[in-house]
């Protein structure tokens, strides 16, 4: 795995070094005969301290960091658009301290209408990509307002979200207001399976062979409330087997509301308020957390939600708060409650230093604890428009 990571790093450095314009933030790299490629780098490093870590079970859902320094990720993205026909492509590589992986690598057919007028309102994606389930799962961690993902997402979608191998079709009917339907099918490909909340907990869906699939339907709409504010509403689903060698299934149902406000043409002040809920209807599941973790229990329904409000009140300062709860209902598992608050100093739109505090309440026999994060996140370069999901209103 380290050799694989070294090879990816060498390839990335060679690509960047191949052009004298590599440092430019507004230009892609010019590669002879092959047109333009947009390149960006994103570094995410933090220091974390937990209260009395000897008494904390670090298998708890929601803790992707360890005590001390963490190289959360160092991302390299290569994106572009072909001139011959309407196709965009993207590859997002993630480097950690001891391994490297492909976060996304896909082809995006954004103008199918040029192939046939019947397909004018359709788009398609094939490859490894982030599933359209809610808003949060679609963005990369450098766009997170806080250092860690919400508990409900970690529980059902994994600590870094779902981004498996498959295909997706979206349809935007030619009506007003805007509405979009999407349907994606994903399998594990060469990966171990569906992302689990922790290394020792069973995943929401069991993906053992290439024939095991998870289907993700979604519908969403977007409304311009005023010249400075907009509102997005979405409903998502996921269907798949929940145990190996079984036909028992889990159905995920999600809803999300995203409100954004920005004052005029400047990047500040602005508000981003995101609320999402996920519920799992499970047929005889293997329990993920609590006293019965790892055991098969009777059918149940378990769900959770979070609400996160970020406010950039000046050119350099932003404050964020999040409240989250898993246990509505709790089914066969323990309830979970966490409150987080963060303050960030923005050196630029792509470089920031943050301090975050979180309180994780008692969950079953796991005692409550506190955590403090110091995060440094910096980016360089540019991404081809249309190949990534961005929630910031600037």
Please provide the spans of the model-predicted regions.
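Sequence/structural signature of outer-membrane beta-barrel proteins
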Residues: 46-50, 96-98, 114, 131-133, ...
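Transmembrane beta-barrel strands of outer-membrane/channel proteins
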Residues: 41-49, 91-95, 126-128, 181-187, ...
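C-terminal hydrophobic structural anchor segments
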Residues: 310-361
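Outer membrane beta-barrel
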Residues: 25-192, 212-216, 220-228, 311-313, ...
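Residues that define the transmembrane beta-barrel architecture of outer-membrane proteins
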Residues: 67-74, 100-103, 161-165, 211-215, ...
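Outer-membrane beta-barrel "beta-signal"
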Residues: 255-257, 345, 368-394
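Outer-membrane beta-barrel translocator domains and adjoining extracellular loop/strand segments
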Residues: 51-57, 98-106, 138-141, 193-201, ...
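Detector for outer-membrane/organellar transmembrane beta-barrel domains
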Residues: 228-329, 392-393
């Amino acid at each position: 795995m380290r050799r694989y990571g070294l090879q990816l790093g060498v390839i990335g450095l060679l690509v960047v070094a191949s052009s004298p314009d590599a440092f430019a933030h507004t230009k892609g790299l010019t590669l002879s005969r092959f047109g333009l490629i947009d390149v960006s780098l994103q570094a995410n490093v933090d220091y974390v301290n937990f209260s009395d870590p000897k008494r904390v079970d670090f298998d708890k859902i929601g803790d992707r960091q360890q005590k001390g320094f963490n190289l959360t990720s160092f991302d390299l993205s290569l994106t572009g658009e072909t001139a011959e026909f309407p196709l965009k492509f993207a590859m997002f590589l993630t480097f950690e301290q001891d391994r490297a992986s492909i976060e996304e690598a896909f082809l995006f057919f954004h103008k199918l209408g040029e192939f046939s007028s019947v397909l004018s309102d359709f788009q398609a994606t094939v490859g490894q990509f982030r599933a359209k389930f809610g808003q949060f799962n679609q963005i990369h961690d450098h766009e997170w307002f806080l250092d860690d993902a919400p508990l409900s997402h970690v529980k059902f979608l994994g600590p870094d979200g779902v981004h498996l191998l498959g295909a997706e079709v979206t349809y935007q009917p030619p009506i007003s207001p805007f509405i979009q339907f999407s349907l994606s099918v994903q399998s594990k490909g060469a990966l171990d399976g569906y992302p689990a909340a922790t290394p020792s907990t069973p995943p929401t869906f069991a993906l053992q062979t290439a024939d095991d699939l998870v289907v993700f339907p979604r519908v969403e709409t977007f409304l311009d409330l005023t010249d400075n504010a907009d509102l997005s509403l979405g409903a998502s689903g996921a269907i798949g087997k929940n145990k190996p060698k079984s036909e028992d299934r889990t159905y995920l149902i999600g809803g999300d509301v995203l409100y954004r406000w920005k004052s005029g043409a400047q990047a500040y002040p602005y508000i981003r308020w995101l609320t999402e809920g996920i519920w799992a209807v499970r047929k005889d599941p293997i329990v993920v957390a609590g006293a019965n973790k790892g055991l098969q229990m009777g059918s149940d329904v378990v769900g959770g939600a979070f609400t996160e409000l970020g406010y950039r009140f000046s050119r350099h300062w932003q404050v964020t708060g999040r409240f989250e709860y898993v246990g509505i209902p709790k089914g066969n598992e323990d309830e979970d409650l966490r409150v987080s608050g963060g303050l960030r100093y923005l050196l630029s739109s792509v470089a920031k230093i943050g301090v975050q505090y979180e309180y994780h309440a008692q969950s079953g026999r796991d005692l409550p604890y506190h955590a403090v994060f110091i995060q440094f996140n910096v980016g360089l370069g540019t991404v081809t428009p249309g190949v990534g999901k961005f929630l910031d209103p600037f």
